[in-house]
């Protein structure tokens, strides 16, 4: 989406990820309140549209989240479902409202609680009309096949994949919002329980509860609200895959490649300009594949990019500086929103103990959603100041 007028992030909020005994609406409100406070918004009537992303917690989740904030009854509240990209999609739509002049202030929220709502044995299954689901395919199995093929084609080892968990846990060491953090060795990752070979338990994200929220506004409102360090949204792009099940290159992701290409073209920012990236590292192999798909390195050089230390502090681009999904866990509808919230905090130098230096000027987030190829959606966003 090419932005018709400038859009700025005024404030962000997020909750700690993990297991929560409070429901999704409490988590969503906590993140929203933090974002509203950071935006100097003290009256609910100042917000002109709201989008709430959620994956599994039922109907009218947005109204449930926002009713106790005084937002019901005076603004449109739109509920967004897009599997794992729901939170990112909610913020994309809030950005669109401001970009098109439909609102001067809008909020996007992603929230989820699986602890209180998990349907045992059926969680996250795609529709049984999906040919891959009918034959027993699940996400972990699909990514395991991608890992096996990638290792066969490139010579990558189990230790290479484990390096990503080690890196991301190290990034999250001092992050109070992360669920899993602290030093872990390559040996501990490789020797943890096998889930779907070659992926072990420590190479798969945990299914978590949590929330994230982002308030966006026009340039005029930035001045009225007195935002000291507004973050400009340089671009925000959503693409969906075609409906087919034909053979494909499972070591790539053409939807992500197309989304990233469109984002760079519309924003005028190239991958070489990006300082930090939060991507969809639901599994170690996913992060490795997305290095190339997002253009962080040339095709065929993702493994070299990792081995050379280019995805961590002191490298070309710090990938998953908050610790990624491998450290936060993955609350389906909330992850995309939390990625953006964490990136904005990095750009505002608000991450003591895990701050990227020098302070990032350009950040990119990437989240995917869907089961089979036909239902996949990709969301990528570039922000700068």
UniProtKB/Swiss-Prot annotation:
Coiled coil: none annotated. The record marks 330 as: Increases nucleophilicity of active site Cys. InterPro entries: Thiolase, Thiolase-like, Thiolase_C_2, Thiolase_N. Induction: Induced by toluene. Keywords: Acyltransferase, Aromatic hydrocarbons catabolism, Transferase. It is an enzyme of class 2 (transferase). One of its GO terms (molecular function) is acetyl-CoA C-acyltransferase activity. One of its GO terms (biological process) is catabolic process. The active site is at residue 84. Pathway: Xenobiotic degradation; toluene degradation. Optimum pH is 6.4 (for benzoylsuccinyl-CoA formation). It catalyses: (S)-2-benzoylsuccinyl-CoA + CoA = benzoyl-CoA + succinyl-CoA. Gene3D superfamilies: 3.40.47.10. CoA binds at residues 19, 121, 193, 204-205. Its EC number is 2.3.1.310. Component of the BbsAB thiolase complex, which catalyzes the thiolytic cleavage of (S)-2-benzoylsuccinyl-CoA to succinyl-CoA and benzoyl-CoA, the final step of anaerobic toluene metabolism. Belongs to the thiolase-like superfamily. Thiolase family. Heterotetramer composed of two BbsA subunits and two BbsB subunits. BbsB forms homodimeric subcomplexes. Both BbsA and BbsB are essential for enzymatic activity. This is Benzoylsuccinyl-CoA thiolase subunit BbsB. It comes from Thauera aromatica. The gene is bbsB.
